[in-house]
Amino acid sequence: MIKTIVMSLLIFAGMVAYDSATSKPTPTTPPTKQEQQQQQINKHEKSAAMALFVSLLPDRKTWPSPMQKFYLAFNMEEVIDPIRQNPQWTPLKSMSQDIPKALIAIEDHDYYNHGAIAVDGVLRALLVNITAGEVVQGGSTLTQQFVKNVFLTHEQSMERKIEEAILSLMLEDNYTKDEILELYLNTTYFGAGANGIKQAANKYFGKAPSALSLAEAAVIAALPYAPSALNPLENPQDCKKRQLLVLAAMHKYGMINQAQLAEAKAERIRLSNGTRI
């Protein structure tokens, strides 16, 4: 048992070290056309090599779970590409920019500055929650949350956490921060049967994601933490409390100013069922 724990910690430490060594800051300029073409060539070469290798193996459904996860780490597009073809898909640039800002503020405020795994984020979240006297902030990055929701189960085990770490690192090696954020918002369950931002905006406000106000975006960002318990149609008071935490976080991290904070807090939001919060 002790040996297993020690090995698990060593593997996790290795993943964090790998992340620190390979994570790249968000580029200040978009890649050139030549760089984009080279990226596509590299991607196709990798896919072709993997396809040839896999063709020599038994049916993938018969592989042990660890082997399936290893394959998935290098072929994430098999899962992600179909998701992007969903008619409900909403590009990041086509939604109110208050939505991603609100989500980042409450779930992972340093999202654009750290890698797939933020060890300091776990410790910081613990301190914030102790200070607040309640769970205000989670320790997982948005990348880890997306991986857990789409590729893995919610099982609480050391094996699952290691798989989550590995897949998160591989995801950030192959997709940009904006792409991962867009994937997160289009796949997350927001409660009341709403999967993805388009369904959530329509379900709770009868609006498109592009039409949400700052106050409404803060409601949406409040939901991933506990989508059923915070469903504003069923639990408006609890949702309002969490929404105020989101707005406070946005102000704290410089995403909105004092006037915007005051206006959003004062807004009487009308939900799709006529309730105002």
Residue ranges and their predicted role:
Residues M1-I277:
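Juxtamembrane regions of bacterial inner-membrane/periplasmic proteins
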